[in-house]
């Protein structure tokens, strides 16, 4: 049925009027060319696509039917790119076909990429526009091409809809589409807050882990259509101005510099998410921007993004002065801006006064470090340092010139047969190792009561006299010493106690092993508090017996110093010989021998013979310091009535006390009666025999 003539005239007038409102962008051969349309088609190889002639969708106010009724025809051309030769398209009607104002590809091939120009014309009018089609392949291992994605942004904690884009041509109006959604090309168990509506995916509350690539898949005929959208999550849109981090707002920051040096003023600020707006940060001097200053030596660096997270950024910009001059000194301000406001902070570039703060601080720091090192070395090696100094530069003690002995050794004498497994090492140390090391190796002159005590009065008075003649008092705290209360002698005698309390003598207390669980140890603690000058040295077992151990160094440090060569003790010398310890000849043994000889001089022959054998068998037992022998005269007439297990004091010839024998006759040639004419045994008082003879 033909349209009435008035209707055709009206349609043509309307179409002509609509063309007048469009501005020409190019004209060639009388045809208006609108170049390439803004809409670009991007599909994956194998997918169907419909390319519409853009002239009917934005360039002219008519559609394909009206244009065709007005006598205009639609032609399609293809070219490889802008300016290339355009050739008419021959439609085969199957894979590529022309349907009204569109071209259908079912499916697309890689060679279909290019520019498709649609032209509407008649004999007097022509208009043209080109449409871009890109056919690509999936990225390796993915279900999409990264150059063909759509992009969406969502704010944290807000809702967001992701649409399956450009699928209108594949939807049927009478049927709901069956769309599958993937994230990163994988099926996913979606949380309840994610809802699917027709061709959209709704996230009701966006989280940071929602960032990623979302792919929708739709089946169309025998083909599959996929669209991929990359979702970016940002922080909520800020409603605050930027925050200055340095320099601090409302506070003047002073930066010192020297003339001729370069200066660098750095401004840092935090910008909340403001959409696609770039952060605005800059420096000013007074009312001038830095680029407006006449000096080329002063310039701004580029804006640097230090940190970025969910669209929020920490940025910085530096103001550099290459060579500072007097005119460069002054106040500089850093400004930061966004759509919500502006902030600024100031820095005063100040000339530094000449001060040697760094040098002074470095010198003091070096001195302090040196002092710390010296103190540490002194704390760790105090004894070694003091011994070295004393051995090379020290002087002997003057206050001990009137003393005869370097130390008085107080110990508990225990027969080796009575040593047990637990205390054997302690007793051996006290009786053998300690005196042997002090005398033989270090050359000290010790007073050992069991060896050197010369009875002149009561036992306690003798001990007090000998302690008074010693520069040090060494108390060896072995378990037996504690059990037998060996220190009680220093509490009974007033003179001894006063010496300890007033500090007249320095006491060296050697503790062997752990003594706290031993009976009477509480009294030992009380004794420590009584002594004024006390040094406690721990002996930790056989490992302390080594010459280079801390124990011997500590003991040597506490002993008096004197320049003396170490001496070696030998066996007892002959009576006619004088050794290095001639003045220390054992008195207890000699005095016992003298007393015994005096008693036997007048004893009955049978008694004398019996005692002679017994005495010599005892005297030849091992002595722990020196061994002395004295041949007892075989004759005597004095009955033996006072010899017992207690101390026996006697009158001894002075030549015998000095360790000498008469030179005129040998002891074997001398008449026993003549040798002991002036000797007699003196009985002891009961109070003198009340002290145990094993404590010295």
UniProtKB/Swiss-Prot annotation:
The record marks 34 as: Essential for interaction with PTPRD. Keywords: Cell membrane, Cell projection, Cytoplasm, Disulfide bond, Glycoprotein, Hydrolase, Immunoglobulin domain, Membrane, NAD, Receptor, Repeat, Signal, Transmembrane, Transmembrane helix. One of its GO terms (molecular function) is NAD+ nucleosidase activity, cyclic ADP-ribose generating. InterPro entries: Ig-like_dom, Ig-like_dom_sf, Ig-like_fold, Ig_sub, Ig_sub2, IL-1_rcpt_fam, IL-1RAcP-like_ig, Immunoglobulin_dom. GO terms for biological process: negative regulation of exocytosis; positive regulation of synapse assembly; regulation of neuron projection development; signal transduction. GO terms for cellular component: axon; cytoplasm; dendrite; plasma membrane. Residues 379-696 are cytoplasmic. Residues 19-357 are extracellular. Residues 1-18 form the signal peptide. It is found in: Cell membrane; Cytoplasm; Cell projection, Axon; Cell projection, Dendrite. Residues 549-644 are annotated as: Interaction with NCS1. Residues 403-559 form the TIR domain. It catalyses: NAD(+) + H2O = ADP-D-ribose + nicotinamide + H(+). The active site is at residue 491. Disulfide bonds join 31-126, 53-118, 143-185, 164-216, 267-334. Residues 666-676 have a biased composition (Basic and acidic residues). Residues 19-134, 143-232, 242-350 form the Ig-like domain. Pfam families: ig, Ig_6, TIR. The chain crosses the membrane at residues 358-378. Glycans are attached at residues 63, 122, 138, 213, 264, 331. It is a single-pass type I membrane protein. Belongs to the interleukin-1 receptor family. May regulate secretion and presynaptic differentiation through inhibition of the activity of N-type voltage-gated calcium channel. May activate the MAP kinase JNK. Plays a role in neurite outgrowth. During dendritic spine formation can bidirectionally induce pre- and post-synaptic differentiation of neurons by trans-synaptically binding to PTPRD. PANTHER family: INTERLEUKIN-1 RECEPTOR ACCESSORY PROTEIN-LIKE 1, INTERLEUKIN-1 RECEPTOR FAMILY MEMBER. This is Interleukin-1 receptor accessory protein-like 1. It comes from Pongo pygmaeus (Bornean orangutan). The lineage of its organism: Eukaryota, Metazoa, Chordata, Craniata, Vertebrata. The gene is IL1RAPL1.
């Amino acid at each position: 049925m033909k349209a009435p003539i008035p209707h055709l005239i009206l349609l043509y007038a309307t179409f002509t009027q609509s063309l007048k409102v469009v501005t020409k962008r190019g004209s060639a051969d009388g045809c208006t060319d609108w170049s390439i349309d803004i809409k670009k088609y991007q599909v994956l190889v194998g997918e169907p696509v419909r390319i519409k002639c853009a002239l009917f969708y934005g360039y002219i106010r008519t559609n394909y039917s009206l244009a065709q009724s007005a006598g205009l025809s639609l032609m399609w051309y293809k070219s490889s790119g802008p300016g290339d030769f355009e050739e008419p398209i021959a439609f085969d009607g199957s894979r590529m076909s022309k349907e009204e104002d569109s071209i259908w590809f079912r499916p697309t091939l890689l060679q279909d990429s290019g520019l498709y120009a649609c032209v509407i014309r008649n004999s007097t009018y022509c208009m043209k526009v080109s449409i871009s089609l890109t056919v690509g392949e999936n990225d390796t291992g993915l279900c999409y091409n990264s150059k063909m994605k759509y992009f969406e942004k969502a704010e944290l904690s807000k809702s967001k809809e992701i649409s399956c884009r450009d699928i209108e041509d594949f939807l049927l109006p009478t049927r709901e589409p069956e769309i599958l959604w993937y994230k990163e090309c994988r099926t996913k168990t979606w949380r309840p807050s994610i809802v699917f509506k027709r061709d959209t995916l709704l996230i009701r509350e966006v989280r940071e882990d929602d960032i990623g690539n979302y792919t929708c898949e739709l089946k169309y005929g025998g083909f599959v259509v996929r669209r991929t959208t990359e979702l970016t999550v940002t922080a909520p849109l800020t409603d605050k101005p930027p925050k200055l981090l340095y320099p601090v707002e409302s506070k003047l920051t002073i930066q010192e510099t020297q003339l001729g040096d370069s200066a660098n003023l750095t401004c840092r600020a935090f910008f909340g998410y403001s959409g696609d707006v770039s952060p605005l940060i800059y420096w000013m001097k007074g009312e001038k921007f830095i680029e407006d200053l006449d000096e080329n030596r002063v310039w701004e660096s580029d804006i640097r993004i230090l940190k970025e997270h969910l669209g929020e950024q920490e940025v910085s910009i530096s103001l550099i002065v290459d060579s500072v001059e007097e005119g460069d000194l002054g106040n500089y301000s850093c400004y930061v801006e966004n759509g919500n406001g502006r902030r600024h902070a100031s820095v005063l570039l100040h000339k530094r006064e000449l001060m040697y703060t760094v040098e002074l601080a470095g010198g003091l720091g070096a001195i302090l470090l040196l002092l710390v090192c010296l103190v540490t070395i002194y704390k760790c090696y105090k004894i070694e340092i003091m011994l070295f100094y004393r051995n090379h530069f020290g002087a002997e003690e003057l206050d001990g010139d009137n003393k005869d002995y370097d130390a008085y050794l107080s110990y508990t004498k225990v027969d080796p047969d009575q040593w047990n497994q637990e205390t054997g090492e302690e007793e051996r140390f006290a009786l053998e190792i300690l005196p042997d090391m002090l005398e033989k190796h270090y050359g000290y002159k010790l007073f050992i009561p069991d060896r050197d005590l010369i009875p002149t009065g009561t036992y306690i008075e003798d001990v007090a006299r000998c302690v008074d003649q010693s520069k040090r008092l060494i108390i060896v705290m072995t378990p037996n010493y504690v059990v037998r209360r060996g220190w009680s002698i220093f509490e009974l005698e007033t003179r001894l106690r006063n010496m300890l309390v007033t500090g007249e003598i320095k006491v060296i207390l050697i503790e062997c092993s752990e003594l706290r669980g031993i009976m009477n140890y509480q009294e030992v603690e009380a004794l420590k508090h009584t002594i004024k000058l006390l040094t406690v040295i721990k002996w930790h077992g056989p490992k302390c017996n080594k010459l280079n151990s801390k124990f011997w160094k500590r003991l040597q440090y506490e002993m008096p110093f004197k320049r003396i060569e170490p001496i070696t003790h030998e066996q007892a010398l002959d009576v006619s010989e004088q050794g290095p310890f001639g003045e220390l000849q054992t008195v207890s043994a000699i005095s016992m021998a003298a007393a015994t000889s005096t008693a036997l001089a007048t004893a009955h022959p049978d008694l004398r013979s019996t005692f002679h054998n017994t005495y010599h068998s005892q005297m030849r037992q091992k002595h722990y310091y020196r061994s002395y022998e004295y041949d007892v005269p075989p004759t005597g007439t004095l009955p033996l009535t006072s010899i017992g297990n207690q101390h026996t004091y006697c009158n001894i010839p002075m030549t015998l006390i000095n360790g000498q024998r008469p030179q005129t006759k040998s002891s074997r040639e001398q008449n026993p009666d003549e040798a002991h004419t002036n000797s007699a045994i003196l009985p002891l008082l009961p109070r003198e025999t009340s002290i145990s003879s094993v404590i010295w």
